[in-house]
Amino acid sequence: PPELAKRIPFPGPALATRIVGEVTEGRLEIVREATAIVEKELEKSRAFQYMAVLLNDKATGIRENKREFGQIIVVRCINSVDARTATVTKIPWNKLNRISKRITSIKGVNRCLYDLTPKPPATIEYI
């Protein structure tokens, strides 16, 4: 059926593959929330695949007038026919801005990046 054949691919080991570095319950919750945002915002993009990835590094930021060292989420949205090569999906600035605001509202996240790297040299997934 089309709903299965045309669905966005998702890795077998689930959300753990969207976390670079140690996988903990807290980090799983962050990537789970970010994934829900990305999927809702990009479901009509007609992209081959889109995802939120939690990096192993942290970034300095400011929240409520206090300095914080927060998590970094990368949003990746790509177009492909066969998954052997892929190009970056051009997403309107206002949508990227909304995604960034929503993701940085997740507790502990203060940075949201959009990955502009095609395949090759990158792969579709991070891990």
Feature annotation, model-predicted:
Residues 1-127:
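ATP/NTP-dependent adenylation/nucleotidyl-transfer catalytic domains that generate, transfer
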